[in-house]
Amino acid sequence: MLNEEKGRNHIDLSSLGHTWILDLDGTIVKHNGYKTDGYDTFLPGAEKFLQSIPEGDMVLFLTSRTKEYAKATERFLCEHKVRYDLIVYEAPYGERVLVNDAKP
């Protein structure tokens, strides 16, 4: 839950383990950089953010990239020591919608 008193970039989370569901292009790396530049580039602050995710948390990436880019994508993440549990390729281009319960 966003905590307005602590600033717009602060989120209060429970002490339970977390599942981070992150879009890849335009959120973590330059949008379509893998196509236009031929390689991925982190957006400012993204690499540091990813390294701050606690070890026991689950990390899922969603992307509209086709599976033909899977090896290059996973190589980039591995070279930068980005830990993840799953990458879902070929997601629709529209919004990502997450529905979750509120923790007490």
Name what the model sees in each region.
Residues M1-P104:
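HAD-like aspartate-dependent phosphatase fold
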